[in-house]
Amino acid sequence: MREQGFIPKDCHFKVSAHTGHGNPCSAKLMESLGANSFNPVRDIQLQMLAAIRAAIDIPIDLHTENPKSSGGFIRHYEVPEFIRICAPVYLKTGGSVAATHSWDTTEADARKRAKQVALVKRVIDEYYPEAIVSPKY
């Protein structure tokens, strides 16, 4: 549909972790259907992330943490490996502050989310300082 002009070329489609995809085959299928980035299920192991990266060329979106309602886990110390294995990768940070998904964020919550971002950046700076930030689009 992009090639035919029905969808603008600069319209990006991001496959959400809520769709439940978590293997190389489904990642490749989503890419072939026009996905611009792929967000696998949140608790996926590093080995599976490496297999997904080998299967697709589009960026991978990864949650560094989650709200309590969807596991409540924090993976900050895995972030350097996320980058090494999955680049290009977009990190989704700050979710552990929320009680649930689609939760209204207060000013205090925004400050807590910013703190989570700073913590992830500190882990990257400490354990993978040679990581390169992607250009902004």
Predicted regions and their residues:
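Active-site pocket-lining/capping segments in soluble small-molecule metabolic enzymes
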Residues: 1-18, 46-137
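Generic hydrophobic/aromatic pocket-lining and core-packing "Φ" positions
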Residues: 24-27, 49
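Conserved, mostly hydrophobic/aromatic
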Residues: 30
